[in-house]
Design a protein with these regions (language model features):
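Short C-terminal tail/terminal secondary-structure segment
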Residues: 146, 238, 249-264
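Substrate-binding pocket helix/loop in short-chain dehydrogenase/reductase
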Residues: 97-98, 105-110, 218
Length: 264
């Protein structure tokens, strides 16, 4: 299916690995010219080259920067003053006891997971409204709806993503611009693979059974009882980025494998 994304310019933050990289690949597969972002220039260049080889008819570019830093964002804006699609994927997480979270850590999570995406949306939204097309997508988490006690500082910011996206969608009324949030469930990224290795490397469970054991014992509410693959999130995000996804805005979209037990 042609999603109508050919030659659309898409900025995907935090796109050198994991879900962000998968989103960038699927957008490029649909013909979009993606801007790859990450903090390490070598990692950014590597992904740009990979996508160029995979999809030679597209024009991927790199924007190495820590977009939690305001000066880095200003440099990005000078280099890329307009985009058609903004995917705010960049974020940090860290399991921590509530009692051990310092004020500085709360501030850091808010700055990285909320304010960076807010600043990008504030800059790029006016052009989208002017051209009467645009997509802003926040990548949140099922933790936005089902906060755990393992990392409250992370859960809080993901819930804030939902609220922010809903508020921004009010500014697009009557236009072809949409603002939505996607909430992935537990996904087999490089970080999760490393977590599984750390959890099970001393156990008697065979590596090929780690995933099933993890889902059974740590994600029992999942209806699919497997980890979601990054490319599944990527394909869904590509659709939400497309002109075909024009009938909803301000939505909190679940791609969680049925992990969240509520209807609404």
């Amino acid at each position: 299916m042609d999603l109508g994304l050919k030659n659309k310019r898409a900025l995907v933050t935090g796109s050198t690995k994991g879900i962000g990289k998968a989103i960038a690949i699927e957008l490029a597969r649909e013909g979009a010219n993606v801007i790859i972002n990450g903090r390490q220039p070598d990692d950014v260049a590597k992904v740009v080259n990979e996508i160029q080889e995979m999809f030679p008819n597209t024009k991927p570019e790199g924007a190495p920067a820590d977009l939690a830093d305001s000066s880095a964002r200003e440099e990005l804006f000078r280099g890329y003053p307009e985009v058609d699609i903004l995917v705010n994927n960049m974020g940090i997480f860290q399991p921590m006891s509530y009692w051990d979270i310092s004020d500085e850590t709360w501030d850091k999570f808010f700055k990285v997971n909320v304010m960076s995406g807010n600043a990008l949306a504030k800059f790029y939204l006016p052009h989208m409204l002017e051209q009467d097309f645009g997509r802003i997508i926040f990548i949140a988490s099922e933790e936005a709806l089902m906060p755990s006690g393992e990392m409250p500082q992370y859960s809080m910011t993901k819930t804030m993503n939902l609220s922010l996206a809903k508020s921004l969608s009010k500014l697009t009324k009557g236009t072809q611009v949409t603002v939505n949030t996607i909430m992935p469930g537990s996904t087999l990224t490089e970080g999760v693979q490393e977590m599984l290795e750390n959890m099970y490397h001393d156990s008697s469970i065979a590596p090929e059974d780690w995933e099933a054991d993890f889902m059974k014992n740590h994600r029992p509410l999942s209806q699919i009882q497997r980890l979601i693959r990054p490319e599944e999130i990527g394909r869904f995000t590509a659709f939400v980025s497309s002109p075909f996804a024009s009938s909803f805005s301000g939505a909190a979209l679940r791609v969680d494998g049925g992990l969240v037990p509520t209807i609404f």
